Structure formats: C-alpha cells, structure tokens
C-alpha cells in the first residue's frame, strides 16, 4: 500500500518575507512532505515589491533554512486561496499566529475555507516567542525610518529593502545602514 504524500500550502503576501515567516516554513516542513509557499499577488495591499520580486526573495532564502527532508516550492497565485490549495493538491493550509488579534481573523478565514471545501484543513502554528512581534508592515516602517531591520529579516532581504527605500527616498549622505547579520 502506498503512503499518500502530505501536501501543505503556506500562503501570504510576504512583502517582505521575514524571519517569522521562515520559522513557520521550517516548522511546517515537520508536518508535511511537500510545502508550497503561495505568494499572493494581492495588489489591493499595495505591495512594496512586485509579485515576481517576492517570489524570488522566498526562493533565494530556501537554501539557507532547514526543511527536514520535505520539499518546498514557491508559487505565485491570484485566485481564491481554497482554489489554489485544491489546484496544488493540498490537504492542509498552514497559517502562523502571532497574537490573539491574528486568531480572530484567521478563525473566520478557516471557517470560511472549511465551508468552501471541508476536505482541506487549516493548521495553525504559533509564532516562536522570538518572532511574535515581527510583521512585514513593521519591518518596512522601521527600515523606511532608518532603523535596524537586521534582527527581523535575512541579510539578503535587508539589502533589497534598503535598496528599495533608497530609490523611494534617498538617505542623507552621512547615513550608513549596516547589512551584516545581527549577532
């Protein structure tokens, strides 16, 4: 008898992808055999990076994280999440929770997704304590205002962010923002 491959989808805008997102990806690979990181086009959110740039950022980081033997792929999508999950053959949607406020929203989404297709479960993973306060929105705000974003994103993502902010609003000539990983 063959064993069915467990496929999960971890959806998000990932604008930018943070260390908290990568923590969820690593931990999700403990419960699925194949994880699809679904990068939502989500133009309504007015993303800083294009969909292609966000997909590339996620792909660039995958070699640097442990996936516990599971395979991970990255795909963009612009359909209903449940349609994307079914199209990918997923049995589970992975969602990260940082706080009670996340739970309220995610609880409603899980209920709606269950109504759309009760065959696909939603699995919540609590954010690790060191990542509970990280959000893409906060990282962008900190970076735009010249704060140190190194504790929240990889060095490669930090470099992309700082480059984008410099294009939007050039920093004063005497401003130096370190790009090395935080100790």
Curated annotation (Swiss-Prot):
GO terms for cellular component: cytoplasm. Keywords: ATP-binding, Coenzyme A biosynthesis, Cytoplasm, Magnesium, Nucleotide-binding, Nucleotidyltransferase, Transferase. This is Phosphopantetheine adenylyltransferase. GO terms for molecular function: ATP binding; pantetheine-phosphate adenylyltransferase activity. The record marks 21 as: Transition state stabilizer. Pfam families: CTP_transf_like. Coiled coil: none annotated. PANTHER family: PHOSPHOPANTETHEINE ADENYLYLTRANSFERASE. ATP binds at residues 13-14, 21, 96-98, 106, 131-137. Belongs to the bacterial CoaD family. Its EC number is 2.7.7.3. Pathway: Cofactor biosynthesis; coenzyme A biosynthesis; CoA from (R)-pantothenate: step 4/5. It catalyses: (R)-4'-phosphopantetheine + ATP + H(+) = 3'-dephospho-CoA + diphosphate. Homohexamer. GO terms for biological process: coenzyme A biosynthetic process. Substrate binds at residues 13, 45, 81, 95. It comes from Rhodospirillum centenum (strain ATCC 51521 / SW). Reversibly transfers an adenylyl group from ATP to 4'-phosphopantetheine, yielding dephospho-CoA (dPCoA) and pyrophosphate. Its cofactor is Mg(2+). It comes from the Bacteria. CDD domains: PPAT. Its main location: cytoplasm.
């Amino acid at each position: 008898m063959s064993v069915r491959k467990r496929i999960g989808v971890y959806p998000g805008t990932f604008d930018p992808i943070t260390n908290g997102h990568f923590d969820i990806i690593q931990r999700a690979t403990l419960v699925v055999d194949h994880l699809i990181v679904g990068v939502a086009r989500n133009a309504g959110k007015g993303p800083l990076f294009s969909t292609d740039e966000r997909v590339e950022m996620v792909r660039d980081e995958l070699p640097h994280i442990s996936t516990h033997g599971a395979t991970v792929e990255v795909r963009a999508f612009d359909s209903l999440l449940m349609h994307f999950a079914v199209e990918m053959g997923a049995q589970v949607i992975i969602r990260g929770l940082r706080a009670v406020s996340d739970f309220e929203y995610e609880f409603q989404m899980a209920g709606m997704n269950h109504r759309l297709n009760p065959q696909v479960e939603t699995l919540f993973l609590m954010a690790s304590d060191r990542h509970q306060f990280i959000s893409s929105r906060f990282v962008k705000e900190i970076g735009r205002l010249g704060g140190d974003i190194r504790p929240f994103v990889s060095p490669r993502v930090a470099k992309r962010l700082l480059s984008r902010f410099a294009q939007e609003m050039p920093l004063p000539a005497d401003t130096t923002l370190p790009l090395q990983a935080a100790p």
